[in-house]
Amino acid sequence: MPLAKDLLHPSPEEEKRKHKKKRLVQSPNSYFMDVKCPGCYKITTVFSHAQTVVLCVGCSTVLCQPTGGKARLTEGCSFRRKQH
């Protein structure tokens, strides 16, 4: 284990584990995602840390439930993280 550590060039894995405010460049942990309904295959945009129950527009199926942090997706729902 080396005693000298490069603070200006941390590894991406190490940087991702840090708190969002203590990173070299601050970035949020939250993101938007496209969630596909398992029943009608419609795509809905959902926030990763949603605080309310999100329903499908087409068939009113519950897509995700809020928890203390990230929203929990319902079984069978597939998602894709949106690019900014």
UniProtKB/Swiss-Prot annotation:
Annotated region described as Disordered, given as residue ranges: 1-23
> SUPFAM superfamilies recorded for this chain?
Zn-binding ribosomal proteins
Domain of life assignment: Eukaryota
Q: What note does UniProt attach to the cofactor annotation?
A: Binds 1 zinc ion per subunit.
Task: Offer one example of a GO biological process linked to this entry.
Answer: ribosomal small subunit assembly
- Give the required cofactors: Zn(2+)
Tissue expression as described in the entry: Expressed in a wide variety of actively proliferating cells and tumor tissues.
Q: Tell me which Pfam families the record gives.
A: Ribosomal_S27e
Q: Which residues, renumbered to this chain, carry the PTM Phosphoserine?
A: S11
Single GO cellular component annotation?
nucleoplasm
Tell me which residue ranges form C4-type zinc fingers: 37-59
Q: Which residues fall in a compositionally biased region of kind Basic and acidic residues?
A: 1-16
List, in alphabetical order, the Gene Ontology terms for molecular function in this entry: DNA binding; RNA binding; structural constituent of ribosome; zinc ion binding
Protein keywords: Cytoplasm, Diamond-Blackfan anemia, Metal-binding, Nucleus, Phosphoprotein, Ribonucleoprotein, Ribosomal protein, Zinc, Zinc-finger
UniProt-annotated location(s): Cytoplasm; Nucleus, Nucleolus
The entry's function note states: Component of the small ribosomal subunit. The ribosome is a large ribonucleoprotein complex responsible for the synthesis of proteins in the cell. Required for proper rRNA processing and maturation of 18S rRNAs. Part of the small subunit (SSU) processome, first precursor of the small eukaryotic ribosomal subunit.
Q: Which HAMAP family does the entry mention?
A: Ribosomal_eS27 (MF_00371)
- Family assignment from sequence similarity: Belongs to the eukaryotic ribosomal protein eS27 family.
What pathology is it implicated in?
Diamond-Blackfan anemia 17: A form of Diamond-Blackfan anemia, a congenital non-regenerative hypoplastic anemia that usually presents early in infancy. Diamond-Blackfan anemia is characterized by a moderate to severe macrocytic anemia, erythroblastopenia, and an increased risk of malignancy. 30 to 40% of Diamond-Blackfan anemia patients present with short stature and congenital anomalies, the most frequent being craniofacial (Pierre-Robin syndrome and cleft palate), thumb and urogenital anomalies.
Provide the assembly information.
Component of the small ribosomal subunit. Part of the small subunit (SSU) processome, composed of more than 70 proteins and the RNA chaperone small nucleolar RNA (snoRNA) U3.
What is the protein's given name?
Small ribosomal subunit protein eS27
